[in-house]
Swiss-Prot record:
It is found in: Lysosome membrane; Late endosome membrane; Cell projection, Dendrite. GO terms for molecular function: phosphatidylinositol-3,5-bisphosphate binding. It comes from the Eukaryota. This is Sorting nexin-14. It comes from Mus musculus. The lineage of its organism: Eukaryota, Metazoa, Chordata, Craniata, Vertebrata. Belongs to the sorting nexin family. The chain crosses the membrane at residues 51-71, 76-96. Plays a role in maintaining normal neuronal excitability and synaptic transmission. May be involved in several stages of intracellular trafficking. Required for autophagosome clearance, possibly by mediating the fusion of lysosomes with autophagosomes. Binds phosphatidylinositol 3,5-bisphosphate (PtdIns(3,5)P2), a key component of late endosomes/lysosomes. Does not bind phosphatidylinositol 3-phosphate (PtdIns(3P)). The modification Phosphoserine is found at S566. GO terms for biological process: autophagosome maturation; postsynaptic modulation of chemical synaptic transmission; protein transport. It is a multi-pass membrane protein.
């Protein structure tokens, strides 16, 4: 048979070589292969082979147990014990798996993470300022008290408040006052800046209270740190010398390096963009519309606060100091003084320093006294959906006037009771659209009277519920809506229009206004138009900048200033001796004056002026009676007089005008407040011996003495050559002094101003140091020093990628495997105990971090941290730590890190491995640019947690970009 098949096979082979194979033989081969493949799939031989490869010991024991069961079948009842154990192990392994974790076994440790509810700030809050409802749909979001005044119900200890106030005061003293005091001494702008800083700090404190700090640390910040450690480990594998570790790590990051680390200028630009991105959430509503304010705050925060703070945190010396504090097992220092009382957050810091009345700050009483303002205020309340708040005040006032009568009839009590029921249904019921939020006891008292018999309404005469409700609503109007109205479009329309008020008669029958006719804003347009009109002076074209109050398209020819001792008198006959010291000067009142220089007859401007009463008594010796007259001078004419007297006679220390008001209205009220100061100035001038025969001063005090001579003009872009040639012939010096200084100052004033950039941008980071001193230093140099056109990826950053490790237990295993290189048996043991102890360890870690944070936020420690931050930002002139001190601190840090590892772990991994691993971590923390990289990554995570709205904005921007 074998030979036969062998013989049959020969011709088959020869036939195959000839290309004529048997179809039956081919079909049989394919059928056998199919059957074997199906049998292999059913038996899962590949899976069995892989299991044997992964678990050789377990498979060997299972094989031995199977062989023993076959050979020793008489003792099968004994072998069932081992089979039960194997079945239990397999069952638990298949049912639980690595993702199945045992709950926390430490029942005494309980940590409750914070529940993230509604955001108190932007875009919705937990309580409406008017009705108190959650997610109020009737009133605008800007009416939320937490949005407009986030410091409400926010209290801190007085010592912490004082420390924060000190830091903010230093911010103003170092970055605002050095240049602001050169402009004006008015504190109005600084007061607004104080409120803005208080708003910013309050928003941060509220948002920090809302986030779960331990969860952020364990779930996000530590994960970013693990990725940073991985980069350092990979970089260390490429280089052996520590000096090249930082550069190797930066190359390992590649395009995933944080954008702020590309260069120091990119870092500053990133901080600027970050602050601008946060402005809608950290500044008061509508504050971002003010370009100058946002630009100033951006430069202060980015260049003078955040940049030095991040440099301080990334400094290896600072990192070593923080590590020593964290590793130190000594008990924390206890407070030596009792806790200070709680005070409203930064209330003392935000108190206004400006004592002068501001046109942008009105009282509710002022609004109610003027019908035009009250009308504007009601329109504003209608726009805000809160006109019923004012209506409640008016209704309660009328109700109180009626109920406080001594004797009330039954009809009057019945009418009052019906009115009270309307008040209750309109303003107290939850279903009412005009509901106002009151304390519960107020609503209960009003409800009890409203639902009781009508004769009980007289009890309201002695009850405090209605009075407290009125005080609450009045406070709401004064503290919330009135400031909002002063910054609203309605009020600005009122200022631009100029309110006509009742007039009064003066001694010269000139009408005035009660509050001042105009605030000067309505004339800005005409002054800008005047720039493009010109007049000639000695062949030079001069733009006509009308600065005087009330000018409208005013054009005048060049004025020749004459100051000499010639006996020219505007009031009396010539050649009469003049002694200004004998003149009596007073400014009894401020009046209004129609500008005769206006070209448009139909548009006469009424300008507030000082009325100067002059009594001349220096000609009695020649038989003349005392002469009386009045002169009307504008506010700016006084400063022109002072400037010209200074040019001819020098300064007079005992006769000085107050600081000139450049920005802001110079209206009737303002001039009235300056009346006594200007009167004293003139009285002191006429008493100076060298001015006793001054023609300039006499012209100023004479009704016809140079009406346009004292109108201040700004004259840029003039022909200096022609002016210099004409000055000696037109100027006659008084007593021959001060001509040369006058000519020099005149030439300087005529020089053309330098062109201004179209969009000015601050470049000086701090007025106390040069720009490059903070931007470039020896520690950070130029960061990674990468070009702007370096390849960048579209994803957010290197650290937001999904990682397989999650939680403190996984982080410890990761560090042990990557850094400490633990043996396989220990790694498998840790993986086995992960199911039992992962949740327990993470719960204990959260509890431990929460306890540490509570200790850190104790009063004395918080004050100490704020002091350290203050010293890091503002103590620029203090000597830095010496290199020897820094090396000593680094050595101490390394020793503490070596001692921190338990001896049991050292026995498992070995002493040499311990040293190499700790050295790797320590060397990674001594690289300033790498520390800065980690700092910015952690900063981004913290910002996204504090301001989750940024994630929505970014998603919308990303979707919009992808759609386009």
């Amino acid at each position: 048979m074998w030979l036969r098949r062998r013989g049959l096979g020969v011709p088959s082979a020869s036939a195959s070589e000839g290309g004529t194979s048997s179809p039956a033989w081919t079909e049989m081969g394919s059928w056998v292969r199919t059957i074997c493949g199906r049998l292999k799939q059913r038996l899962r031989l590949d899976v069995g082979r892989e299991i044997c490869r992964q678990y050789p010991l377990f498979c060997f024991l299972l094989l031995c147990l199977s062989v023993a069961s076959l050979l020793l079948n008489r003792y099968l009842h004994v072998l069932m014990i081992f089979w039960s154990f194997v079945a239990g192990v397999v069952t638990f392994y298949c049912s639980l798996g690595p993702d199945s974790l045992l709950p926390n076994i430490f029942f005494t440790i309980k940590y409750k993470p914070k529940q993230l509810g509604l955001q108190e700030l932007f875009p919705q809050g937990h309580s409406c300022a008017v009705c108190g409802k959650v997610k109020c749909k009737r009133h605008r979001p800007s009416l939320l008290l937490e949005n407009y005044q986030p410091w409400l119900d926010l209290k801190v200890s007085s010592k912490v408040d004082a420390s924060l106030s000190e830091v903010l005061e230093l911010v103003l003293e170092n970055f605002v006052y050095p240049w602001y005091r050169d402009v004006t001494d008015d504190e109005s702008f600084v007061d607004e800046l104080r409120i803005t800083l208080r708003f910013f700090a309050s928003v941060l404190v509220r948002r920090i209270h809302k986030v779960d700090i331990p969860s952020i640390i364990t779930k996000k910040l530590l994960k970013a740190a693990m990725k940073h450690i991985e980069v350092i480990v990979k970089a260390r594998q490429k280089v052996k010398n520590t000096e090249y570790l930082q550069q190797a790590a930066l190359e390992e990051y590649g395009p995933e390096l944080h954008v702020a680390l590309r260069s120091r200028r990119d870092e500053l630009q990133y901080l600027r963009k970050l602050t601008e991105l946060l402005f809608p959430y950290i500044l008061p509503p509508k504050a971002t519309d003010c370009r100058s304010l946002t630009l100033l705050i951006r430069e202060i925060l980015s260049g003078s606060v955040l940049l030095p703070s991040l440099d301080f945190l990334a400094d290896p010396d600072t990192v070593n100091h923080l590590l020593i504090i964290f590793i130190d097992d000594s008990p924390p220092e206890k407070a030596t003084e009792p806790a200070s009382p709680l005070v409203p957050f930064l209330q003392k810091f935000a108190e206004p320093r400006n004592k002068k009345p501001s046109v942008l700050k009105l009282e509710l009483k002022q609004i109610r006294e003027q019908q035009d303002l009250l009308f504007r205020f009601m329109n504003f309340l209608k726009q805000e959906g809160a006109v019923h708040v004012l209506q409640f005040c008016l209704t309660v006032e009328e109700f109180n006037d009626r109920i406080l009568r001594p004797e009330l009839s039954n009809d009057e009590m019945l009418s009052l009771h019906e009115e009270l029921q309307k008040i209750y249904k309109t303003y107290c019921l939850d279903e009412s659209i005009d509901k106002i939020r009151f304390d519960p006891f107020i609503v209960e008292e009003i409800q009890r009277i409203a639902e009781g018999p009508y004769i009980d309404v007289v009890k309201l005469q002695t009850m405090r519920c209605l009075f407290e409700a009125y005080e609450h609503v009045l406070s709401l109007l004064e503290n919330v809506f009135t400031p909002m109205f002063c910054h609203s479009d309605e009020y600005f329309r009122q200022l631009l229009r100029g309110a006509e008020s009742p007039t009064r008669n003066s001694k010269f029958n000139r009408s005035t206004q009660k509050r001042g006719e105009s605030f000067g804003i309505s004339r800005i347009g005409s002054k800008i138009k005047g720039v493009f009109k010109s007049t000639t002076m000695e062949g030079a074209v001069l733009p006509n900048y009308g600065v005087a109050e009330g000018e409208d398209d005013f054009i005048e020819e060049g004025i020749v200033v004459m100051e000499d001792d010639s006996p020219v008198e505007a009031v009396s006959t010539p050649n009469t001796p003049r002694n200004l010291a004998a003149w009596k000067i007073s400014i009894p009142y401020v009046d209004f004056f129609e500008d005769p220089s206006s070209e448009r007859k139909e548009k006469k401007e009424r300008i507030p002026v000082f009325c100067i009463d002059v009594e001349r008594n220096d000609r009695r010796a020649v038989g003349h009676e005392p002469e009386h007259w009045s002169v009307y001078r504008r506010y700016l004419e006084f400063y022109v007089l002072e400037s010209k007297l200074t040019e001819f006679h020098g300064t007079f220390p005992d006769a000085q005008l107050p600081s000139k008001r450049i920005i802001g209205p110079k209206n009737y009220e303002f001039l009235k407040s300056k009346r006594e100061e200007f009167q004293e100035y003139l009285q002191k001038l006429v008493q100076h011996p060298e001015l006793s025969n001054s023609q300039l001063l006499a012209d100023f005090l004479s009704p016809n003495g140079g009406e346009t001579q004292f109108l201040d003009k700004i004259l840029p872009d003039v022909n200096l050559g022609k002016i210099i040639k004409s000055v000696p012939g037109k100027l006659m010096k008084e007593k021959g002094q001060h001509l040369e200084p006058f000519i020099m100052s005149f030439i300087n004033s005529c020089e053309s101003p330098k062109p201004k950039p179209s969009r000015p941008e601050l470049t000086i980071l701090s007025p106390t140091s040069e720009n490059n001193k903070k931007l470039f230093n020896d520690l950070f140099k130029n960061n990674a020093n990468r070009a702007e056109n370096t390849e960048r990826k579209q994803n957010q950053n290197y650290f937001m990628e999904v990682m397989t490790v999650d939680g403190v237990y996984d982080y410890l295993m990761y560090v042990g495997r990557v850094v400490f290189q633990v043996p396989d048996w220990l790694h498998h043991l840790l993986m086995g105990t992960r199911i039992l102890f992962k949740n327990t360890l993470e719960m204990y870690t959260d509890y431990y971090l929460q306890c540490k944070l509570e200790q850190l936020f104790q009063e004395h420690r918080l004050v100490s941290l704020i002091t350290l931050l203050r010293d890091a930002i503002f103590c620029e002139n203090t000597e830095p730590r010496s290199l020897q001190d820094k090396q000593k601190g680094a050595k101490q840090t390394f020793e503490e890190m070596m001692n921190y590892i338990p001896d049991l772990i050292v026995k498992c991994i070995g002493e040499e491995t311990k040293y190499e691993s700790i050295r790797l971590l320590f060397d990674g923390l001594q690289q300033p640019v790498l520390n800065k990289q980690l700092t910015y990554v952690l900063l981004d995570i913290v910002i996204q947690e504090l301001f989750p709205e940024l994630n929505k904005v970014q998603k919308e921007a990303t979707s919009m970009t992808s759609w386009m």
